[in-house]
Amino acid sequence: NVFAEDVQEADVLPDGSVCHVYGGFRICHCPETFPRSYISDSHPVESYSVLGDSLVVDAQPEVWTQMQKRLRVTLRPEDVEVQIGIKNTGAWAVQCAAWGISACAPGSTVVFAGSSEDTGYLPNRSLVFWPYTKIQDARMQFFNAYHVVRCDPARAEPLKLGCRNTQGWAAAFVHQQCYIKHFAREAAREYPDFDCNFETYDADWGIEVESLSPLQMIEPNQTLWHTERWEIHSGISLPTAMPQEAELHQILQHLGLVETDQFCK
């Protein structure tokens, strides 16, 4: 299983309910805050159906926020399409972003690309760090073209970072497999967390590969949709837990994530 399984991690909300993390994949609405982002979803779904190659699931609306999480998973020969929906079932418009979180197994190494845009006199990339992240943390490694974050099961202290991911992919290597998540970046739209459409959270129990939609005002009875595409490749691994840039480039070319040598000039 490329995904983490965490049955112990849980948060107790002010009303006494418990939000279990569980691992795997989950849907949230962003920006993150407590307790709104941690409402328990450990209850039966409102509805589900199978339509051809697609599974469609609607959770029960959250009583406090009146937001309803929706999921449509479509199996395709080349990949899996995962559509994340946030529906406003309340009476007023709400601004938020859809947030897809894939919690990958302990020992995973996550790789994502920097920007290769030639913006002349203007900056072309940024990295965003959360307050509990130590910049010198050895689990993070930064190159010109790619960035690497490694999950160390012996390191419990968390870290989190994000970026404006213009390449639209992130990869997690674990168990001689590579899980790839594809997602969009809409240049003219505003994103949460200092303009992040990609984020990763790392702790001892696993590492998260997260994509975010643009911020959107969701009117009553309207659904905000955000799409991810997933691939899993078997029989592939990194040469070391913290590989060098040239090694990464060769592997990513093999996976079809890098088409040219633009990053390693």
Regions found by a protein language model. Name each.
Residues 1-85, 89-265:
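Surface-exposed acidic/polar loop and edge beta-strand patches at domain peripheries
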